[in-house]
Amino acid sequence: MPDNHGPWGLRWRAKPSFILTTVAMGLFTDLVLYGILLPALPFTMRNRFDIPNAEIQHYTSAFLATYAGASVFFSVPAGWAASKLGSRQLFLGGLMFLVVATAIFAFSTSLVLLVVSRLLQGMSTAVVWTAGLDMVQDTVEPSQVGETIGTIFATISVGELAAPVLGGVLYERGGISAVFAVSAVLLAIDLALRALVIDKKTAVKYESPRLIRFPVERNMSDDHVASAPTVMEAQESVHEGTRLLPQVDDDGDHYKIDRELGSIVRAIPLLYCFREPRLHLAMLLSFVQALFIGTFDATVPTVAESLFHFSSLQVGLVFIALMLPYFALGRLSGQAIDRFGTKAAATSGYAFLVPCLMLLGLPEKNLVPKEANVALFCTILALNGIGLAVVTSPGYVEAIDVTTKYQVANPGHFGENGPYAQLFGFSSLYFFTGLAVGPLLGGFLRANFGNAVMGAVYAAISGVTAIVSFLFVGVRRFGPGLV
């Protein structure tokens, strides 16, 4: 048993800055090991498995959808397990799936094993994102959730940005073995951080609550940390009315559970929260965002190869145009949500994406010389990247807001570990469903009708989402018991 002082290095291992760094590194590694394969995947299909050129788009979309489908299937179980076992243990365990998946992909000689590797990586992603975001929610103040998620997403977007480029360089220079070697180094660093981190729920058992700081540390000075509220103080402030953005109403009675619950809802208490339509809309935002991301992941490599005859390295470089806005605008987008609310961010982001998605059909018309056409393609991707950066956080923040209201109105209903692991499990379910549908729908539309029709369909989806966001996101206007 640990002594009264707790585990070795408790203070720094339980610091918010270290917890958030560990979570960010876990998500970063997950995205890198996903993105590092994107530019190499079409070439791997052809060179290792002799897939005909005409079928490469189909196989590429199918493998990406397999990964996302596994994430869909395991998201809710991961949320349930995190709420029962604790997020830190699950966060560490999820890495094992990723290690095995990476090794199988590097050395597999059959399509069946390649499918297995995608399934395992999808399982790992479901666990890592669900448990990781739950640890973030436990660590930061409610009023800082939007900025924190935006900052983390901006940080890990470096992985999204660098991975395709790195994958293209490594595959072109050293083949799949070079890709695996770099992946192994990242996994080793990630494993060390996950083994060391101590989450807040564990840390508070060993020390006085006043020594366990709750909010995000904006810098590392002791004076600043000393002025921060503690876990207990922050929890008290929540019960006194602290709210996540967007702030919508104070009707606590609406969120009060006043009926006998069935066995399924008692086992998964978050299910009751879906009586609130805003939670469904929050999940819809996550689905549509992922739908677009999955489509770009599946179609950008094949468009770049077929239209411009790019190598794997050049395909990786093209992704910079799409991912750079994430890095540049992620934190600003999160701050804007904390200040102006989810309605403004979701509405403006999806409205902005409408014309950007419509432009996707221009490059294939060859209206300008090849060099200018490449620049046009990259510019269109960058514009879409700006829109995607804006719509990254609203769904998460909206869902947290609704769930927090239920938690405050019903103390103890969600158990010792709270509702957020289950929430992020369901959020991941919707997100990865979009990530699974995106490659299939986008690949089908592009292969059968071309980029122009694909862009028009997605622009229509984005327009409808913008209208729904303007009318209903952040505002409780319909549903049972509303006034």
Curated annotation (Swiss-Prot):
One Pfam family of this chain: MFS_1
Q: Which GO terms describe its cellular component?
A: membrane
Q: How does it sit in the membrane?
A: Multi-pass membrane protein
Protein's UniProt keywords contain Hydrolase? no
**Main subcellular location of this protein, as a coarse class:** membrane
Enumerate the subcellular locations listed in this protein's record, separating them with semicolons: Membrane
What transmembrane ranges does the database entry give?
Answer: 18-38, 62-82, 96-116, 149-169, 178-198, 281-301, 310-330, 344-364, 374-394, 424-444, 453-473
List all annotated glycosylation positions: 219
Identify the domain of life: Eukaryota
Keyword Glycoprotein appears in the UniProt entry: yes
What disulfide bonds does the UniProt entry report for this chain? none
InterPro entries reported for this sequence: MFS, MFS_dom, MFS_trans_sf, MFS_Vesicular_Transporter
The record's CDD domains line, in alphabetical order, gives:
MFS_MdtG_SLC18_like
Family to which this protein belongs: Belongs to the major facilitator superfamily. TCR/Tet family.
As for what it does, the entry says: MFS-type transporter; part of the gene cluster that mediates the biosynthesis of pyrrolopyrazines, secondary metabolites showing insecticidal activity. Probably involved in the secretion of peramine and other pyrrolopyrazines.
Q: Specify the protein name.
A: MFS-type transporter ppzB
Organism of derivation: Metarhizium rileyi (strain RCEF 4871)
